[in-house]
Amino acid sequence: MELEKVKINSLHCNDAVLSSLQASPSATSPQSVPSKANVVTEASIIEKTNQPHNVQEDNNYNRDCDSPESSSSEQDKELDDLRNLHSSSLTNSVVVGKSTGSLNGVYSITSVTSETKTLESVVTTNSASGSACLSNTPTADHIKKRIPSSRTPTRKALRIKFYRNGDRFYPGITIPVSNERYRSFERLFEDLTRLLEENVKIPGAVRTIYNLCGKKITSLDELEDGQSYVCSCNNENFKKVEYNTGSQPLSNLPLSNSRSNSHRLAKCRPSSPLKNGLLAGSSPFPACGGGTGNGSPLIASRLSDRVTVVHPRIVTLIRSGTKPRRIMRLLLNKRNSPSFDHVLTAITQVVRLDTGYVRKVFTLSGIPVVRLSDFFGSDDVFFAYGTERINTAEDFKLEAEEQRAINVIRKTMRTTGTTCKGPKPKMPIKSKKVYPPLVDSEPFKAETTPEDDRHAALLTSTGMEINELPSNIRNTYSLGRIIGDGNFAIVFKIKHRQTGHSYALKIIDKNKCKGKEHYIDAEVRVMKKLNHPHIISLILSVDQNTNMYLVLEYVSGGDLFDAITQVTRFSENQSRIMIRHLGAAMTYLHSMGIVHRDIKPENLLVKLDEHGNVLELKLADFGLACEVNDLLYAVCGTPTYVAPEILLEVGYGLKIDVWAAGIILYILLCGFPPFVAPDNQQEPLFDAIISGIYEFPDPYWSDIGDGVRDLIANMLQADPDVRFTSEDILDHSWTIGNKGNECTTYKR
């Protein structure tokens, strides 16, 4: 048994249609139909419509219908015929009313006999003329049509345009936004991050959306169709600039919800060390199957040019004006230099011309700079002009004072070697407490001493009792030797009783850090957020009244300070491996807005092979780490590795970690730090650090290449504004070179 569906949208039918209806199985006598089957479900939907597209849709359904003009009397007669026809065959009648020119869509579902024929007649009404027709085809089996349901209307997605925060040249990207497509704000953030990474360099994931007036958007319901918004990454504040609202967006994504649209959210994206710890030497644009995602050849070409041309470098800028002119420096990298216009904007923000934007740039020899690659060639000094007139005879000549200023800048970036006078500088002394011989010389002694007695002896040597250990740690792990110590904590090697895996147990004495408890809380809070192959993992944390216990990942090779004291200096290949791993860890931290503040060899753990070569480096000890929401002013760190802005107390941020990494790279290659003072006196040391002037003395640097010297010079810039970022370290040509991670022997 089937259901016969009749949809009546009009009140005008011809004789052929009426004959078809009378000959249909529904005319069977009621006695031949089982009583339970004599059920008629009637659904009448009457709605007024004046929308042109609805009329057009109805006309498409009835393009084969005969639609002559009919009078009111003819319609009345046809209505009576239809009533008589249905009343003779249905247990419940179908109500059919007189057309008023606005009747649209009357459904009738009638139970019939077991004959398997289905009739679906679609009739439309033209609301303007009051005339329509009943669709008819030769056989009922061939007139099945899908009836759209008005109960589940398709919601139209909002068409929203998004800009990159502070980027006045980025033309924006337009995407459809709806509650069906994005169930949460975080999902929209993920898609915006992926789309922006394909077109511009961004410092991290999209975290905030603003309107063009700077108001923060907190829900999808606040977005308006056809409006523009600004995407902010990490903790960036809204930058009120003249966004490129009149330009054509880079990518206008279709509004279709079809999953077959492979171009909607292309997953072809640069591999980034921020999230997966990959080395910078890996291919930044992996091939994507199925074509270029979201992609025009113009965008792909632009990204390719940026990758091949742009590299981190510091340029010197001479501001146009009255002589002697102001001399400034600017760090160019992939974030602020994706195009020629972006570089002009960056220069404008630094030189601050009285005439406004920088319009023209010249080299020191007076050659106009017209391409992006010109900023990354052999010239590193440029004149910046606005709309003012240029006197080529005088403007490109440097006065003595201007030349001296440029020479001072170049001196701070010196990469040539000088002869070292006097004895070779030494590494600073590693602070370490002295414990009884039981701990240092005979760490385990399990054969002669019961385990509990050995644990008690180890803890007693540090002023602790065996019962002070938390039960879940005492029952799960076997205590080993002391492997590290600091001002507030001590670190034991422990072993899991069931698996035999080694871990490190850090015990922080709260009594020794009175008033600094927030550092302990910050360390645990930060480490719980981290997951990176070159950062020590936190396995378990237990907080008690007197101590904080942290079970950490164990690295077998010890810390980098001990490795340096054993081998004195490392080869460039070994140093490259370590700086890659350290740079990847810092980039990951900085992308989350976290600064370590105590990067030094004692806090870098290394894994060695059987020949003593470094295979892996991991960053540890987050006791001073914190999240950066604004400039920090607390003076902390280790004197040898402290950055100038910390000593000057002018406020500092993420780049103090880059300075410390530059000191470490210098030490790896020659065995001593760039800034030293006699007898380890702090005042002369701090003066040297603030000056930012150091040398690459021979013979210790005679066999070391210019590439790594250039990297060190950029990492040890006293001015944090022009100092390399952690990403710039990974992008440098020396760091990218020899990607194979091949191990070579130490330099003895």
Curated annotation (Swiss-Prot):
Binding site for ATP: 483-491, 506
Keyword annotations from UniProtKB, A to Z: ATP-binding, Kinase, Nucleotide-binding, Phosphoprotein, Repeat, Serine/threonine-protein kinase, Transferase
SMART domains hit by this protein: DCX, S_TKc
GO BP term, pick one: intracellular signal transduction
Cellular component, GO, one term: nucleus
E.C. designation(s): 2.7.11.1
The Doublecortin domain, residue ranges: 158-244, 313-396
Catalyzed reactions per annotation: L-seryl-[protein] + ATP = O-phospho-L-seryl-[protein] + ADP + H(+); L-threonyl-[protein] + ATP = O-phospho-L-threonyl-[protein] + ADP + H(+)
Family from the record: Belongs to the protein kinase superfamily. CAMK Ser/Thr protein kinase family. CaMK subfamily.
Origin: domain of life: Eukaryota
Statement: the UniProt record of this protein carries the keyword Transferase: yes
Any one GO molecular function term: ATP binding
Domain annotation Protein kinase: ranges: 477-735
InterPro entries: Doublecortin_dom, Doublecortin_dom_sf, Kinase-like_dom_sf, Prot_kinase_dom, Protein_kinase_ATP_BS, Ser/Thr_kinase_AS
Extent of Polar residues compositional bias: 22-35, 47-59
Identification of the protein by name: Serine/threonine-protein kinase CG17528
Residues the record marks as active site: 598
Phosphothreonine: residues carrying this PTM: 91, 100
Annotated region (Disordered), positions in chain: 22-41, 47-81
Annotated positions of the Phosphoserine modification: 67, 70, 73, 87-89, 93
